Amino acid sequence: MKTADPLLKNEYSKRVYARLGLRRPFTVQQETRHYRMPVLQEHGGHVVLRSGPEIPSTEWTNLEYSTPPTDPTTWFAPLATATGENILQGFWDFGKPDLDGIWTSNADRAPGLVRYVDSMGGRFGRIQIIRQEPTSIREARWGLHLDDNNRLNPMANGWVVRLWFQLTDDPDSSLVLRRGQFDRANEVRVPLRRGTQVLVDSEALFHSGCHKGPDRRYALIVSLESTDHLDGWVRSQLP
């Protein structure tokens, strides 16, 4: 897929692209019988937790990264995938929901992050570290999107949500959240200080990262199954 010229990456051109059918429309989640955590519903679809554990930088700088062809400014280091290989593919490509991830060789070099995920005590799916180059708020708003975490997820399972854990200290950068794709009036920006943990229903809230720079930004992104146990863990992490 050809990427848009950087100067055209703004929400005004995005509206035009959408109306002309040049961008695939996002599918807004419908009500399902999946278990959803009350703690997320109480906080409107996202909840900011207290600061997470200290992780040495060697656990994210010495990994194998790849970039999707549509976004050359963003790279990912898979820690858990559908097959255990260092690949950027959805679990559905292998007939699986985004659960029961298998640790990759990258995870062997990130023992603190593995312990962090294991401490939550639940099922996880895709786990990856994002490495982001400086990105303006204009470009971030262009990149607002919904995830597709629950494709193939049986109704007997919990709803899959995502946790962001900020590894570098970028207080002038933010995770941008919106209920509606073009609803700037109700936009939320979560500052990305080192240790910031944000749990998001990423199929309900449009989201993107704005990174002021000048250095690269690193964060861990974890797909998690909603359960009573995870609800309790989240509440234990509230400020």
Predicted segments, located by residue:
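Non-heme Fe(II)/2-oxoglutarate
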Residues: 1-128
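A sequence-composition feature that detects small, non-aromatic residues
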Residues: 4, 18, 77-82, 107-110, ...
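Extended aliphatic helical segments
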Residues: 16, 28, 39, 47-48, ...
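Structured loops at beta-to-helix junctions and adjacent beta-edge loops in soluble globular domains
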Residues: 52, 66, 79-82, 132, ...
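Residue-level detector of functional hotspots within protein domains
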Residues: 113-115, 151, 206
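Catalytic core of Fe(II)/2-oxoglutarate
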Residues: 174-239
